[in-house]
Amino acid sequence: MLAAAIASFASNLPGWLLAFGMWFLIWTPLVALLEYATHRWIMHMANRLLDPRLDQLKAHVTHHRGSNDDEFVNMPLKNCLLLSSPFLLLLLGGGLLAGSPTSVIIPAAAFLTWSFVYTYLWTVIHRAIHGVEQNWFRRIGPAFRFFRNHHLRHHVHAHGNYGTVFPLTDYVFFTWLGGDVRPRRIVMRRRSKTKRARA
């Protein structure tokens, strides 16, 4: 019986992997929307429904003031799972109502995998952008510069450029901040030199 189950698993593996990959791609817009919504409406607004103690807002304000400690730059897996869990529960509940919870195992696994991948990408990209560590993302040249410039514009003008891993969401929601904007600390440093020169 075990041998038959293993043989069945092995023969169906290519189909399962194809379905997993398809669902991984299908979930991409939802993950991008979750990133955008979280950054815009939880990290930049007092939202006691989704963040009762305003921990995310306070931590993000500290980060925007220049703190690049791990707790302000990294994406905790716990936070990502808290955001994705309602969708996983809806998916599993839908499978139970349809009568076949196994029909949602692959879509749920793909969405859960996206949660892990997203947490990793956010942390790597964000750490590279803020110079916290030299990692593979800093070495990809033009793509790194694009992501860095997009994100640093957000630090100068916090009313746009909310997409860190998915910056194109800012085009979709009309919050793209273009143009040549210097990071705040450089602008502040130059102002202080000008003030000293005048004194």
Annotate the PLM regions.
Residues 2-23, 93-109:
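Helix-coil boundary and interhelical linker segments in multi-pass alpha-helical membrane proteins
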Residues 10-13, 26-27, 33, 88:
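N-terminal membrane-targeting hydrophobic helices
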Residues 191-199:
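A membrane-cytosol interface segment of integral membrane proteins
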